[in-house]
């Protein structure tokens, strides 16, 4: 793939002062720049220590020059790295010297973009570079590294290859009707289709776990008024983020707190108490609470363990059952264990539902059980060598592919329509291609790489 022949340069290390700072150059002028600044042509892939000089020969700094001729470099072009002292003034003088020699200032993410355009890495791998830099936990960093090494891309490529094989079979049968292949009676197409759907479902589930580790899990605290929801928010946040009183309906709007548990990002949402009310303001709060419940990754249903209705908490608010997307996303919190006499404990029922008895206000007893549970929900220390990082756009593409395959299967089994199945298979393949960049618009590429750091 052709890329612009301009030479680009940027400071590749973080802003501020440090022991070492790096100026990176990529493009056809990288070798000329190296020779002009160091006074000699560096031997490829060897570290050369010496002075860095300006146009008059005055020394700007001393450091190490590394030269990588293309295509054996990160970007696939000639690349020069000048590693000097990490002061911002020194680095800026060195960068200005590179620009003076014909380079232009790189856009954010342009080095990674050129690596993608030169087939040095695919789009998912390029995004993994940014994810690795921005990782907020060791687990997220490990997942990002696996994506950078191609684990996620390989899973997508395997799915794509199976789709291509299926498309070849289906479209050949359509193009050569004299063969009289009956898709349903044959059974081969349906078997292949179900195999791809099952594998795609597994990848989607694993990608969802990777996205939680990267972006953070949205945890909604829901329940009746005065169940202790705001107290639980404050306990998790470690500060008085929400007003707590004995008056029912104190919380009338959605409150959001961003917290970390052992480096794992969580977006905790406190909501208005769920009850019938004639108060217009509180009614709006209840509606917003139900909306937040529908969008949550995990729901903490808080009940007052001292209340009689605590024995059947899911019957407290029928609309809650209608609103929650998946019962498996709900964790029951029996609060006020210090008053009810409940033992501080985490229990898992036969059907997998988790109940935690704790006290949000009495020294936060049981809070550590909740923290460990939330970490487990995010996949903390539960990953394997096949785990990888993923982004929301990856999940959207995987869901689009899954929906297309589901629709195609319906077309095949209900109408025997091979032509319509072929179109659904094409759309599924295109959706998967958007993940790795096999099918990507210029606008999409621009949005992705512009979110990177300058110098990456």
Swiss-Prot record:
Cysteine pairs forming cystine bridges in this chain are none
So where does K(+) get bound?
226, 245, 247, 250
BP terms from Gene Ontology: tRNA methylation; tRNA wobble uridine modification
EC top class named in words: hydrolase
UniProt-annotated binding residues for GTP: 226-231, 245-251, 270-273, 335-338, 359-361
**Listed GO molecular functions?**
GTP binding; GTPase activity; metal ion binding
Required cofactor(s) = K(+)
Q: What does this protein do?
A: Exhibits a very high intrinsic GTPase hydrolysis rate. Involved in the addition of a carboxymethylaminomethyl (cmnm) group at the wobble position (U34) of certain tRNAs, forming tRNA-cmnm(5)s(2)U34.
Quaternary structure annotation from Swiss-Prot or TrEMBL: Homodimer. Heterotetramer of two MnmE and two MnmG subunits.
Give the record's family classification. Belongs to the TRAFAC class TrmE-Era-EngA-EngB-Septin-like GTPase superfamily. TrmE GTPase family.
UniProt protein name: tRNA modification GTPase MnmE
Its gene name is mnmE
């Amino acid at each position: 793939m052709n890329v612009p022949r301009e030479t680009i340069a940027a400071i590749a290390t973080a802003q501020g002062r440090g022991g070492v700072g790096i100026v990176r150059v990529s493009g056809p002028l990288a070798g000329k720049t190296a020779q002009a600044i160091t006074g000699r042509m560096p031997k490829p892939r060897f570290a050369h220590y010496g002075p860095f000089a300006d146009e008059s020969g005055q020394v700007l700094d001393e450091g190490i020059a590394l030269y990588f001729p293309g295509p054996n470099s990160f970007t696939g072009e000639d690349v020069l790295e000048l590693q000097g002292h990490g002061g911002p003034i020194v680095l800026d003088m060195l960068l200005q010297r590179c620009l003076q020699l014909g380079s232009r200032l790189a856009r954010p993410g342009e080095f990674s973009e050129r690596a993608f355009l030169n087939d040095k890495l695919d789009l998912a791998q390029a995004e993994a570079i940014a994810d690795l830099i921005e990782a907020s936990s060791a687990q997220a960093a490990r997942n990002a590294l696996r994506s950078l090494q191609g684990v996620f891309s390989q899973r997508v490529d395997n799915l794509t290859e199976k789709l291509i094989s299926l498309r070849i079979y289906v479209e050949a049968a359509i193009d050569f009707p004299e063969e009289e292949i009956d898709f349903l009676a044959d059974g081969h197409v349906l078997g292949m289709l179900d195999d791809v759907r099952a594998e795609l479902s597994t990848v989607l589930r694993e990608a969802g776990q990777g996205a939680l580790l990267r972006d953070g899990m949205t945890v909604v605290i829901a329940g009746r008024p005065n169940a202790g929801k705001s107290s639980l928010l404050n306990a998790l946040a470690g500060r008085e983020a929400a007003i707590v009183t004995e008056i029912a309906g104190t919380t009338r709007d959605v409150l959001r707190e961003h917290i970390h548990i052992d480096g794992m990002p969580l977006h905790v949402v406190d909501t208005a108490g769920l009850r019938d009310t004639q108060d217009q303001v509180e009614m709006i709060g209840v509606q917003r609470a139900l909306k937040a419940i529908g969008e949550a990754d995990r729901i903490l249903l808080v009940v007052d363990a001292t209340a009689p209705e605590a024995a059947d908490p899911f019957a407290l608010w029928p609309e809650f059952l209608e609103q929650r997307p998946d019962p498996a996303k709900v964790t029951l919190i029996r609060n006020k264990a210090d008053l009810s006499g409940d033992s501080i404990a985490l229990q898992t029922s036969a059907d997998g539902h988790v109940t935690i008895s704790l006290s949000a206000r009495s020294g936060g007893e049981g809070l550590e059980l909740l923290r460990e549970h939330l970490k487990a929900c995010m996949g903390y220390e539960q990953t394997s060598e096949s785990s990888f990082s993923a982004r929301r756009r990856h999940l959207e593409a995987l869901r689009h592919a899954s929906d297309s395959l589901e629709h195609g299967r319906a077309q095949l089994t209900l109408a025997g329509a091979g032509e319509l199945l072929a179109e659904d298979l094409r759309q599924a393949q295109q959706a998967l291609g958007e993940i790795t960049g096999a099918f990507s618009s210029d606008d999409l590429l621009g949005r992705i790489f512009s979110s990177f750091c300058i110098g990456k």
